[in-house]
Amino acid sequence: PANADFQNLSTTFSILSDTDADLNETVSMEIHIVPHSNLNFGVEGVSAFTVDEMVRTSVAVNITNNASYVDNVVFSLHTNSGWGWGWNMPSISGNEAYISMEPDALAIVSIWIDVPAVVDGAPLANTGPRFQIDAVSSLDKAVSTWSFDLQMNEKKNATIDDIEASLSVAPNSDGRVSALVRNVGNTPNTLNITLQ
């Protein structure tokens, strides 16, 4: 019933067969009658942010407890990237953060992420890893999620990997020097070479 008391119950029931006298199974169950949670992030869908290499980037989002009860929320972050990250929140244990939220309360969930250097063209411009923040309710264990992508800004860079020995050129004459030039940025690049 809708007005049932919040409680934990243990029950068992037996399964018997009319056609097989040997079939007699007993099943035990734990029943938890709990209040309904209603956690909502302030953003829907997947967000995308442009980031620069080698910058510690902060990302924050608001979350609201729209339920009628205090909710002790546990936050976790999931990503397939190897980028370093951590919580910008007061209550942290291991890789999780915690907030106790009164009904109709709004809180800020904040993390930092260390964006790595662009190395040998990776990560490419306008690409990057996805991060997902999970908020688990203490009321009914429901999970609310918000995902965001960190997309790398353009980085133009080049290296001279190999060059022949120095070349002296007399006035009114020409010569050639071979050089191996490599684009190590994360976007197409036009290289200009200046001789001195």
Label every PLM stretch briefly.
Residues P1-N3, N80, P116, S137, ...:
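Residue-level recognition of the GNAT/N-acetyltransferase active site
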Residues P1-N3, P90-V119, Q196:
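Intrinsically disordered, low-complexity Pro/Gly/Ser/Thr-rich segments with frequent PxxP/GP/PP motifs
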Residues M29, F41-V43, D71-S81, W85, ...:
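Short, well-ordered beta-strand segments
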Residues F6, S17-Y69, S137-T187:
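Long, low-complexity ectodomains and other extracytoplasmic segments of secretory-pathway proteins
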Residues N8-T12, S58, I108, G128-Q132, ...:
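Short, conserved beta-strand segments of beta-strand-rich sandwich/propeller modules, principally
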Residues E53-V55, P103-L106, T127, S173:
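Surface-exposed loop/turn positions
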Residues A2-T11, A117-R130:
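Short glycine/proline/serine/threonine-rich loop/turn segments at secondary-structure transition edges
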